[in-house]
């Protein structure tokens, strides 16, 4: 049963790749160029960015790496015939690219706000987990861990205002 099913799937993938070979090759070429360019850019400029604690550089490079990863997922989904799933990942790719461009355009303060919002997300997540730990049947964070995170959370709210506690 499984052998026959796998054989049918493999045959479909072979036909799909054969039918769309030129398009897949072009997409894969673009992905490789983007990945290698990003690696070289990071290798060349990372030392200076690290010495300057350039959070914009760090976030944009991370987003670029994430975008390359998502692009590879898209290629894999397309080759295997999952066009709708590939389109969903394409929307995620667009979101990552748009976020990186927004951070690059708006500079250091924007990058820091984005970067440190992880503390807000963590604190909110800790509270939710603690609240529902019995339903989840998974031990939530300790009171001490929550308190430690709350200190950082409160400092960020003081710095950026009450609205910073909201989801974006």
Regions found by a protein language model. Give the residues of each.
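Secondary-shell segments that build the walls of catalytic and ion/ligand-binding clefts
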Residues: 1-52, 120-168
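Short, amphipathic alpha-helical segments
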Residues: 68, 87, 110, 140-143, ...
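Short, solvent-exposed helix-helix connector turns and helix-capping sites enriched
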Residues: 20, 82, 106-107
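Short amphipathic alpha-helical surface patches that mediate protein-protein
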Residues: 91-94, 115-119
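Proteins with a high burden of low-complexity, intrinsically disordered sequence enriched in S/T/G/P/A and R
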Residues: 80-81, 111-113, 166-168
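Short, glycine/acidic-rich hinge or "gate" loops at secondary-structure transitions
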Residues: 86-87, 104-114
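Acidic/His-rich structured neighborhood in mature extracellular/periplasmic domains
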Residues: 103, 117-122
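Long, hydrophobic/aromatic-enriched structural stretches that serve as scaffold segments
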Residues: 37-103
């Amino acid at each position: 049963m499984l052998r026959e099913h796998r054989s049918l799937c493999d045959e479909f993938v072979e036909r799909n790749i054969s039918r769309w070979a030129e398009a897949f090759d072009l997409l894969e070429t673009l992905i490789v160029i983007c990945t290698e360019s990003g690696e070289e850019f990071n290798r060349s400029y990372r030392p200076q960015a690290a010495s300057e604690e350039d959070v914009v550089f760090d976030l944009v490079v991370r987003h670029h790496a994430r975008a390359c990863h998502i692009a590879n997922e898209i290629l894999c989904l397309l080759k295997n015939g999952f066009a709708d799933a590939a389109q969903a990942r394409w929307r995620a790719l667009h979101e990552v690219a748009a976020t990186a461009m927004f951070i690059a355009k708006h500079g250091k303060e924007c990058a820091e706000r984005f970067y440190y919002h992880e503390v807000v997300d963590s604190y909110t997540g800790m509270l939710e987990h603690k609240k529902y730990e019995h339903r989840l049947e998974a031990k939530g964070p300790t009171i001490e861990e929550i308190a430690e995170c709350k200190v950082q959370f409160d400092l960020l709210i003081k710095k950026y205002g009450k609205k910073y506690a909201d989801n974006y």
